[in-house]
Amino acid sequence: MHPRRPEGFDGLGYRGGGREEPCPGVRPFGGGAEMGHWVTTPPDIPGSRNLHWGEKTPPYGAGTPLGAAGLNEEPGLGAGGPGAEQLNRFAGFGIGLASLFTENVLAHPCIVLRRQCQVNYHARNYHLTPFTIVNIMYSINKTQGPRALWKGMGSTFIVQGITLGTEGIISEFTPLPRELSHKWNLKQIGGHLLLKGLTHVIAMPFYSASLIETVQSEIIRDNPGILDCVKEGIGRVVGMGVPHSKRLLPLMVLIFPTALHGVLHYVISSIVQKLVLLFLKRENSHSLPTESSTSVQSMLDAYFPELIASFAASLCADVMLYPLETVLHRLHIQGTRTIIDNTDLGYEVLPINTQYEGMRDCINTIKREEGMLGFYKGFGAVVVQYTLHVAVLQLTKIIYSTLLQNVS
């Protein structure tokens, strides 16, 4: 239940040291150069503004040091004319937008099928490869229409917003650090991870409601309102709202697996992103661009290492925690009287009637009745999701490279 995108932007730097006094000759905030700087700052990645074990990722490519630019000049803007300057100013926005669009919109059908396969204990076809996933996507789209693959997308955005807002509020009114400085210690790390765990626990009822909207079959489900996720989440807490069966697990039973999954996903993705950024930084330092391609290459070196690191971090965390996510989703969905699509056929519906007593019982039952591969049901959807993400990133890189070369 982690947000798939960054919690913030390192470029703002609002949690650094004391407020710096403006130097003489520097224009106040709001000028053209400053606005250009905010636009071209590389998009951050999950955890990068929280776990600063080394230096922060340089906002500009290795081939264009910050000190080489004048007070009123944008770093990384070569002498390519106003066209190249304009493209550079909006390059970060465009590239980051493409990545956000892929993760939250284009990949949503993969998330829908992935979750339906995870909670479908009836399934004989585990959909471990992308080929069977694409086939079942086609079948569901043919019988139920395109809406069946995009259901619950609005609620996923709401859960992300609740998660980010909760984290910000807790960090403001408690000593738990939302970010870690360069000189961190074990106490700060413990408080920081505690903040992450509390955030996921508070957002847990809304995550359950969003999960139900995502896996509920389009055949029998009514058109939900955009705030139904919030209403159902509050109803789950106070014990009101849609009636559930006696097999519904209390929220206290869900706290540990929910917090464990959220914290582990954050830690794994943060470590992987740091390692990938360190590797890419060393690679870029050994291959400096030529003068003719400095503007183009410096722009690409500024933005794409961040996106590649974010991609690798999310992929590794999703793959490593996939079995735990399967258990988590089955516990959340139990007792909610949810009807899902038949992921074997694509044109029937199935009820969810599990009777797990808790996390340990769920793990033992899956292992006994479905085998070890039962924890990886729907894994082919992950392959499709990240393959699509790679394709969009590569296409975006080609488009920006072509545009910048044409105007330079």
UniProtKB/Swiss-Prot annotation:
Share an example GO biological-process annotation for this protein. cristae formation
Disordered: annotated span: 1-23, 52-80
Which compartments does it reside in? Mitochondrion outer membrane
Spell out the InterPro entries in the cross-references: Mitochondrial_sb/sol_carrier, Mt_carrier_dom_sf, SLC25A46
**Record-annotated membrane-spanning stretches:** 93-113, 157-177, 189-209, 248-268, 304-324, 373-393
Q: Spell out the SUPFAM superfamilies in the cross-references.
A: Mitochondrial carrier
One Pfam family assigned to this protein is: Mito_carr
Q: Where is it chiefly localized?
A: mitochondrion
Membrane topology of the entry: Multi-pass membrane protein
Task: List the molecular function annotations (GO) for this entry.
Answer: protein-containing complex binding
> Which PROSITE patterns would you find in this protein's record?
SOLCAR
Q: Which UniProt keywords apply?
A: Membrane, Mitochondrion, Mitochondrion outer membrane, Repeat, Transmembrane, Transmembrane helix, Transport
Composition bias of kind Low complexity appears in 66-76
Repeat region (Solcar), residues: 86-177, 301-403
The entry's cellular-component GO terms read: mitochondrial outer membrane
Instruction: Please describe what this protein does.
Output: Transmembrane protein of the mitochondrial outer membrane that controls mitochondrial organization. May regulate the assembly of the MICOS (mitochondrial contact site and cristae organizing system) complex which is essential to the biogenesis and dynamics of mitochondrial cristae, the inwards folds of the inner mitochondrial membrane. Through its interaction with the EMC (endoplasmic reticulum membrane protein complex), could regulate mitochondrial lipid homeostasis and thereby mitochondrial fission.
Family per record: Belongs to the mitochondrial carrier (TC 2.A.29) family.
Q: What is this protein called?
A: Mitochondrial outer membrane protein SLC25A46
Species source reads: Gallus gallus
Q: What's the gene? A: SLC25A46
